[in-house]
Regions:
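Short linear Ser/Thr-Pro motifs
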Residues: 86, 246, 354, 439-440
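Long C-terminal interaction/binding lobes of large macromolecular proteins
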Residues: 328-329
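Alpha-helical solenoid repeat scaffolds of the TPR/TPR-like class and their adjacent stem/linker regions
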Residues: 1-312
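Short beta-strand segments
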Residues: 240-242, 253, 265, 318-322, ...
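PAPS-dependent sulfotransferases, especially Golgi type II membrane carbohydrate sulfotransferases
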Residues: 136-139, 149-160, 169-237, 288-292, ...
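Conserved nucleotide-binding/hydrolysis micro-motifs of P-loop NTPases
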Residues: 268-270, 348-351, 403-404
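Short, conserved active-site loop motifs that form the nucleotide-linked donor/cofactor pocket
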Residues: 261, 339, 395
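Conserved phosphate-donor/acceptor-positioning beta-strand/loop module used by diverse small-molecule
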Residues: 332-354
Length: 477
């Protein structure tokens, strides 16, 4: 009971403690296994959660919900084929389980099976024609026709929709209107969808706070930070960061196509370590950096490598992609002096528009407003320039447009920077079979092409964004 109360309040760490205590007395209770697994999953401990979900499946093999939970946990670990098998088992037990079918579609998309993903989402809409998650999922995986667009317009006009559904349908409608070449109305749908998303966020974006954070990081790392004394620490790690929708998933897919590199997808071990250190010191990052010793950085580096060991089980190098990682480049290199960092940049207007077209969680609250996006982008570029100046041998500046224009040359330079021999598989990245957990899954299954730019189609709708970027010191081409 105490575990259930703690989980309902969002105190998942306490819930885990409660469920583990009770489970010691009743280890064969599938309900306790399930609740413990769900609490662990909420803490980002998908591997531990999987163990409990597997046991729950053994105890109650005819329960579709436990197979669904297992599929979710496996997917969070990028174990795509296993996730598909678990979700298929859930649907075999209950074919009308909508959420399992949506999750299966997501897994298919992440594995490059776009047609199968679309088929599952269309089946969801056959069962539930107004399902917002299915419509949004389709927007990431297919081109809408006029009939889809008309249906979405009718749905979006309804006044009885929950806020989340209204938001997702707005993004889907915008994509449908783009597919019909009606960018003026697409922008109106985006504006309304983002306003709805912004209003429903639990934590409101604070642009001034973000500016202070970026300034504090620059000021802190402008003073020499003594790194870990182990100069070879982190030689296994290739850290990838950048703004959302800027090409970081593409860069990871290229690197993961190399026979010596494991693509870990988006992982949060570095950020979790920094947060844990901040709690331990009762001091926010980057305030404690000034008093951190070389032994502290060495300890943190060892912890990071221990946490990420699973990604080096079969290959010597791995990618760690995190879209908040650009704040922590200095900390990462203090922990891991031999690591390599790739910061991906894309045309600022294209980047901001791509973010504005996508539904994010509270973490990316800046994406709901073009003014906030401009400020966030300016801060990102300002700190990126700082990292490139401070760590020229350890940080690689990858311009998305340069990669598109001359992929072979840029990929050669990137591999050289990472200390990797050239491999032609990196040029054939779209053929690499692996689970991709981000919304860019379908794009990285295609060869590089120059047709990804969209901002010109929106014309003067983006003039304010351009002005705001220029006012913040961002140079536009």
């Amino acid at each position: 009971m105490l575990g259930m109360v703690a989980r309902s309040r969002g105190d998942h760490a306490k819930a885990v403690d409660c469920f583990q205590t009770v489970l010691a007395a009743w280890p064969e209770d599938f309900f306790l296994r399930t609740e413990l697994g769900l609490s662990l999953l909420s803490l980002g401990e998908a591997q531990q959660a999987t163990e409990h979900f597997r046991r729950a499946c053994e105890l109650t093999p005819d329960s579709e919900s436990v197979w669904f939970n297992l599929g979710e946990a496996l997917w969070q670990q990028a174990r795509g084929e296993e996730a598909v098998a678990a979700l298929q088992r859930a649907l075999a037990l209950e074919p009308r389980q909508i959420q399992a079918r949506i999750s299966l579609a997501r897994a298919y998309a992440g594995l490059g099976r776009a047609e199968a993903a679309v088929a599952e989402l269309r089946e969801v809409l056959r069962l539930d024609p107004d399902n917002a998650d299915a419509w949004y999922g389709l927007s990431l995986n297919t081109i809408f026709d006029a009939a889809d667009t008309a249906h979405l317009q009718q749905l979006f006009a309804r006044t009885d929709l929950p806020a989340r559904a209204h938001c997702l349908l707005g993004f889907a409608l915008a994509k449908a209107l783009e597919d019909q070449h009606d960018h003026a109305r697409a922008f109106d749908a985006l504006r309304e969808a983002n306003a709805s998303q912004r209003a429903s966020m639990r934590v409101k974006w604070d642009a001034a706070k973000e500016r202070r954070f970026v300034d504090a990081i620059r000021n802190t790392f402008a003073n020499a930070v003594p790194p870990s004394p182990d100069a070879t620490a982190g030689k296994e790690a290739i850290l990838i960061t950048g703004m959302p929708r800027s090409g970081s998933t593409l860069v990871e897919q290229i690197l993961a196509s190399h026979p010596d590199v494991e693509g870990a997808n988006e992982i949060s071990d570095m950020l979790q370590l920094v947060d844990a250190e901040s709690r331990r010191r009762a001091s926010m990052f980057p305030l404690w950096v000034a008093v951190a010793t070389v032994e502290d950085w060495q300890r943190l580096g060892h912890e990071y490598l221990a946490r990420t060991a699973r990604w080096r089980a079969s290959k010597p190098r791995f990618t760690d992609k995190n879209l908040l990682g650009w704040h922590y480049v200095g900390a990462a290199l203090a922990m891991l002096p031999a690591a390599r960092v790739i910061i991906v940049r894309r045309d600022p207007v294209e980047t901001c528009l791509a973010c504005y077209r996508h539904s994010f969680t509270d973490v990316a609250g800046f994406a709901c407003d073009l003014d906030d996006l401009a400020d966030y982008c300016a801060g990102f570029l300002r700190l990126t320039r700082f990292w490139l100046d401070e760590y020229p041998a350890q940080v690689f500046d990858l311009q998305y447009e340069a990669l598109i224009a001359d992929p072979e040359a840029v990929i050669h330079r990137m591999l050289d920077f990472c200390g990797l021999p050239f491999d032609p598989a990196c040029l054939e990245f779209h053929k690499t079979q692996r689970a991709v957990l981000t919304p860019s899954a379908s794009q990285v299954r295609q060869p590089l092409h120059r047709g990804s730019a969209r901002s010109a189609r929106y014309g003067d709708k983006l003039d304010r964004l351009r002005e705001r970027l220029q006012d913040a010191g961002v140079q536009l081409e």
